[in-house]
């Protein structure tokens, strides 16, 4: 996990590539917007980021805070990246 914003390391699941949005675009949005706390459909607390990427596309990003069992540094795991224009 080499990506980071501020104090957080960032990891990405494979499913974040579903809409063919690159990690750099997701990192840009995460670094330039304030997250909103949300609860996922699985009832897990998460952060929602919505904002324009470096190309002007508005993206929505959902990230979970992960606390490893071995007391390693917590990190954000991005589980969803999608252009908001695809939202019905």
Q: Language-model features: where?
A:
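Ribonuclease/tRNase effector modules and their secretory precursors
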Residues: 1-88
């Amino acid at each position: 996990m080499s990506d980071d914003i501020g104090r957080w390391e960032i990891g990405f699941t494979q499913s974040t590539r579903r809409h063919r949005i690159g990690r750099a675009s997701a990192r840009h949005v995460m670094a330039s917007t304030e997250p909103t706390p949300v609860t996922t459909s699985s009832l897990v607390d998460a952060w929602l980021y919505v904002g324009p990427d470096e190309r002007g596309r508005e993206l929505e990003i959902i990230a979970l805070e992960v606390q490893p069992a071995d007391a390693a540094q917590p990190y954000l795991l991005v589980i969803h990246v999608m252009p908001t224009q695809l939202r019905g």
